[in-house]
Amino acid sequence: MSFDAKAFLATLTELPGVYRMLDIGGNVLYVGKAKNLKKRVASYFRENLSSPRIAHMVSQIASIETTATRTEAEALLLENNLIKSLAPRYNILFRDDKSYPYIVLSKGKFPRLGFFRGNPDRKADYFGPYPSSWAVRDSIHLMQKMFRLRTCEDTVFSNRSRPCLLYQIKRCSGPCVGFISADDYAADIQLAAMFLLGKQQEVTRRLTKSMEEASAKLAFEQAAVFRDQIQSLHQVQEKQFVSSSKGEDVDVLVAIKEAGQLCVNLAMVRGGRHLGDRPFFPTNAADSEPSDACAAFIRQHYAAHPAPARILSYPLPSEDEAGETEVALAELAGRPVPVQEGRGATHKAWVEMAIQNARLAILAKNQATAQQEQRLAALQDALQLPEPIARIECFDISHTMGEATVASCVVYEGNRMKKSDYRRFNIRDIQAGDDYAAMRQAVSRRYDSIAGGEGTAPDLILIDGGKGQVSSAFSALADLGLTHLPMIGVAKGEERKPGLETLIFPEGREPLQLPPQHPALHLIQEIRDEAHRFAITGHRAQRGKARKTSKLESLPGIGPARRKALVARFGGLPGVLAASIDQLAEVPGVSREMAEKIHSALH
């Protein structure tokens, strides 16, 4: 039974909202937002649709669900949440869940210059966001050189008796030991903030004036400091290929389609300074146009991140799309956020730079893909596997003398590490330090669902270990009836140096040692090292948690609320152990009698 569009449209409201198109199986094909639900949904049922991709989607529609909202901003936020959670087949999807980094200047008598990632609050001054952590750290390095601000943590700052190395190399003015007054340090902080806001000319003017005043007072050492700051500032300005004297906050967005890839590149300009860019390669975009990708990126990105004063887009979204999006962005930001093409020499230069960097990103991605495919082909050939390798899973075990044993399983798929499929296993009910039993348990728990017909089986299993670990892992597969899954162990050489690994096979096949430069070995090392990293971070967290709470959890009469209060008061088990009975009795919910019992049980 075909979808009756005419009857459905007659029931639609003209309010803003979100629509979801579903196929006959109830799968969501597409999620969209609209200023006018009735008008937007009706546009899909015109005779001449602009895109074959959209026409194919419309032919599969069995039903449409709608949600009316009060404003276009609400519709934008709801659309973004649904796209991220449902991942519809016909939506261009951008994975941009990472928060962007900022430069932060803390409050206080001697503020700290630092790196921040997260949601800014009012406890400090934030500058950014920046497209990458590298861009922030590079800017912090420049700020240290120009303004000599401290970057040490407050705990270090308050306990120093002599200046650190940064003072010796003229990257800090030494406020920790009183080598600069609070007033002079505050002046440097003000100049740094002005620089980050794009007021370089004003910073230069003030430094020049200070240098001249110091020279007039014959304070030549101080004048030399100002001179060096001015020179550093000029060097920074020379490195900035294209900057704006207007101190603008602009995002430059370009989308290009070349060499089988669609890349959306976001360049960030803050305070007139070009801070760098970040390329995105969306999924479900093979048949999409660059203008559609720009429109999708604007909706998804700025529903989750603050919008700048202006967005330059190349190419521009359609006129209707751009207009609706501008209204929604203005509601979210509380001010107009124009989406426009580059106008003027500076804006056009920014767009050209973003296009060039998008092309470089496509080239780099295709080269990386070709390299990974070469590695996979070399691995298939080296192991004499009949089928191409698409998915690899690798196991590793981590513990400290048998304490807090954790197994990791990392996944390589689609020419990259697939972190969404990673798993950790807290190993229990084995003899402490028994790596073989730990490996057997981890493999058994991971593939139990595969034996039951659920999930995705790997094309190759890597075991970080030698004959014993491989034998234990293979035994677990045998119990599950999965011995057809290819498996190898990666045994380190006697000197435990990369390139000397030996590949161990189950069931008696001769071990294999690949040359150090073999591409298959490089791939194995990359995956093995990631499994080790994932295992050891999980182990450390588990060990720290166990050491912090294990004895507290075994105390009679101490439930979760009291345990939480004790940890909050004393910072963990060591603090509780060091506390006296009187100090324990001061904790909310702990009586004198209970404090005596706790103290007695712990000592």
Swiss-Prot record:
Pfam families attached to this UniProt entry: GIY-YIG (PF01541), HHH_5 (PF14520), UVR (PF02151), UvrC_RNaseH (PF22920), UvrC_RNaseH_dom (PF08459)
GO cellular component terms attached to this protein's record: cytoplasm; excinuclease repair complex
SMART domains in the record: GIYc (SM00465), HhH1 (SM00278)
Subunit structure, interactors included: Interacts with UvrB in an incision complex.
Stated role: The UvrABC repair system catalyzes the recognition and processing of DNA lesions. UvrC both incises the 5' and 3' sides of the lesion. The N-terminal half is responsible for the 3' incision and the C-terminal half is responsible for the 5' incision.
UniProt-listed HAMAP family: UvrC
Record-linked NCBIfam families: PRK00558.1-5, uvrC
Protein name: UvrABC system protein C
Record organism: Dechloromonas aromatica (strain RCB)
